[in-house]
A protein has these predicted regions:
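Short catalytic/ligand-binding loop motif for oxyanion handling, primarily in non-cytosolic enzymes
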Residues: 37-39, 45, 91, 100-104, ...
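Active-site neighborhood of HAD-like aspartate-dependent phosphohydrolases
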Residues: 14, 18-67, 178
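Conserved Lys-Pro-Asp/Glu-containing loop-to-beta segment of HAD-superfamily phosphomonoesterases
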Residues: 122-127, 132-133, 137-171
Length: 205
């Protein structure tokens, strides 16, 4: 059965109180571009310009025309530190995709090669911008990272009480939190890890 676009507007939020008791129940999601993967450097490599210097239609056309663009991106300078700090919590990857369908498999291939753990790709970028299963199946096995590709605006469909998203796009925070989740606005690894520890999601050092 397809998982349709969510419509919940629940504000039941998992706050700081009691988080330590629920630590094992927290579900971690981590974005790729701008968090683990250096998307900006990739764009600059193939265009000679920074992403914000390009009109969106030119940027995405270049991404679509560059063979294996997402698969060949490098890590953010502090991306491996972040991943190594959270991978013990059995996180899933939650990453937005452009309209070119081949980009979905490219992102999954990057994760399979780079994350150092078994992965399972689940494509949720459905027709008419729906959040529904297009291909793949979520693994429930411990230690397997589900790589969930979806439309960015639908990331909140994965949110619920205890769901933690690390993402660099602040515009996604409101909808994620409205469904009960915890949003970590990523600007760098040091700050994100500090916030996770402050909330009791990661142990203090």
């Amino acid at each position: 059965k397809a998982e349709r676009t969510c419509t919940s507007s629940s504000t039941d939020c998992c706050g700081e109180k009691g988080l330590n008791e629920q630590q094992q129940q927290c579900k971690m999601y981590c974005d790729l571009d701008g968090v683990l993967v250096d998307f900006d450097a990739g764009i600059q490599r193939v265009t000679g310009s920074k992403p914000h210097q390009l009109p969106p239609y030119i940027l995405w056309a270049k991404v679509a025309s560059t063979p294996d663009f997402f698969e060949n991106l490098g890590w953010m300078a502090d991306g491996k530190e972040l991943w190594n700090s959270i991978k013990g919590m059995n996180p899933d990857i939650l990453t937005g995709v452009p309209t070119a369908k081949k980009c979905r498999a490219q992102k999954a291939a990057w994760c399979e090669r780079e994350l150092g753990v078994p992965t399972s790709h689940v494509d949720m970028a459905g027709t008419k911008k729906a959040h529904e299963v297009v291909s793949g199946r979520r693994s429930k096995k411990e230690g397997v990272v589900n790589v969930i590709t979806c439309w960015s605006r639908n990331k909140h469909c994965e949110s619920r009480r205890g769901a933690v998203l690390i993402d660099d796009r602040l515009s996604l925070q409101q909808d994620w939190v409205a469904r009960g989740g915890i949003f970590i606005h990523h600007t760098n690894t040091r700050k994100s890890l500090g916030e996770l520890r402050r909330l009791g999601i990661l142990p203090s050092i």
